[in-house]
Design a protein with these regions (language model features):
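C-terminal motif of bacterial Sec signal peptides marking the signal peptidase cleavage site
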Residues: 12-15
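Extracytoplasmic beta-rich repeat domains
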Residues: 20-53, 80-96, 117-133, 156-179, ...
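Structural signature of WD-repeat beta-propellers
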Residues: 63-64, 103-104, 141-142, 185-187, ...
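Short loop/turn segments that connect beta-strands within beta-propeller blades
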Residues: 72-75, 112-115, 150-153, 195-198, ...
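Loop/turn-rich, solvent-exposed surfaces of beta-rich toroidal or solenoidal domains
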Residues: 273-280, 288-322
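Blade-level signature of beta-propeller repeat domains, shared across WD40, Kelch, NHL, RCC1
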Residues: 330, 335-367
Length: 367
């Protein structure tokens, strides 16, 4: 039987071994770019492992209480709202028409423009947001079992279950679409699956686990993954960051660097923070180190968003940091509600949405 380990337990283990240093005080800055909050909204606390989806000028988000809503990105106007009928364990996946979440009762729930269309019982807990793509809904449990459902009627199409490690991570993993292929994280391996049949096409390790016990060797890929054309990159929990050519099924590069949050980037740069919140930026094509920054160490950084000339992180005090992609220097800092930023900032058009643990939705627009 597989056992699960959550981030809270790992944090407790770390705290028992040594006291985590206090967050680095924020340095005084002179804003180098203009930016402002353009609208805000609120949900009843962010859903665990929340992934904000941005599509066709809309943000789709989910609250811990089961609420699911879509908002216009430019002005925050509510487009539709629904409810899964129970508190959530993971969300949200959306293709613009359908939205899927998973409840604490181990049910995947599909909504269409706010109306519940179907529910399906799952055999295990889920901490990764479902993927909705190609008229299918893909759900991966914390036991790494992958189920595919028909988006129209909830019919189970196939199940992928493979031998795995005795210990798995209860944290959002990788479930992503690449052309006609489903990509899922299986431990430290990026695995390509036929979305029609559930058969494995190829897999490749993005990192090499180290350590002398099960906890130290824990190396599940943490999501969401980063797609850069034919290349897909992801963090391997506490072990490294790697990129693979998903068209060829080959490793492009891998770097040993600790960390627990997902990475961000674009065609030129891949960015992530390690376990101490030291930020590193690598050249996307080669993996060569471009720069590092220690100005935000121990501030509990979110996964980043790279857009334009900026790298955007949220922190545990609700601050949103806009860093210069050239060298990591702070260009702008904007506040939210003081609670931790819990998901990577999301972009729709020229609007950036940040979600906090207390359920605050804050839309910013760099100018």
């Amino acid at each position: 039987m597989r056992r699960l380990i959550g981030l809270s337990l790992l944090a407790l283990l770390a705290a028992c071994s040594s006291d985590r240093p206090k967050p680095t005080p924020l340095e005084a800055i002179t804003p180098q770019i203009a930016g402002r909050q353009v609208w805000s909204a609120r949900i009843d606390g962010a859903a665990p492992g929340l992934i904000v989806t941005a599509r066709d000028g809309e943000f789709t988000v989910a609250g811990a209480d089961g609420s699911v809503l879509a908002l216009q990105s430019d002005n925050g106007r509510e487009v539709w709202r629904g409810n899964a009928g129970a508190r959530l364990s993971a969300g949200i996946g959306s293709d613009g028409r359908h939205a899927a979440v998973v409840t604490r009762d181990n049910e995947v729930v599909l909504l269409e423009r706010g109306a519940v269309k179907w529910r399906a019982r799952l055999a295990s807990r889920v901490s990764t947001a479902p993927l909705v793509a190609g008229e299918r809904v893909f759900v991966m449990g914390v036991d790494r079992v992958v189920n595919a459902y028909d988006a129209l009627d909830g019919r189970l199409l196939w199940t992928l279950q493979r031998p795995g490690d005795p210990l798995t991570l209860s944290q959002p993993g990788v479930v992503a679409a690449f052309k006609d292929t489903l990509l899922v994280g299986q431990g430290q391996r990026l695995t390509a699956v036929d979305p029609l049949r559930g058969s494995v096409r190829w897999e490749i390790a993005l990192a090499n686990p180290r350590g002398t016990n099960e906890v130290e060797r824990l190396s599940d890929l943490t999501g969401p993954a980063l797609r850069l054309g034919d290349v897909v990159c992801a963090r391997s929990f506490q072990v490294g960051v790697g990129c693979a050519n998903a068209q060829l099924g080959t490793l492009v590069w891998s770097r040993n660097v600790g960390g627990v949050q997902a990475i961000g980037g674009d065609a030129d740069l891949v960015v992530g923070a390690d376990a101490s919140d030291r930020i590193s930026a690598w050249r996307a094509g080669s993996g060569d180190l471009a720069w590092t920054s220690e100005t935000l160490r121990y501030r509990g950084l979110s996964a980043p968003l790279v857009v334009g000339r900026t790298v955007i992180f949220g922190d545990t005090e609700g601050q949103v940091h806009f860093l210069d992609r050239a060298d990591g220097k702070t260009l702008l800092r904007l506040p939210t509600d003081g609670s931790p930023v819990v998901a990577a900032p999301a972009r729709a058009g020229n609007t950036i949405l940040v979600v906090t643990k207390n359920g605050g939705l804050f839309a910013f627009r760099p100018e």
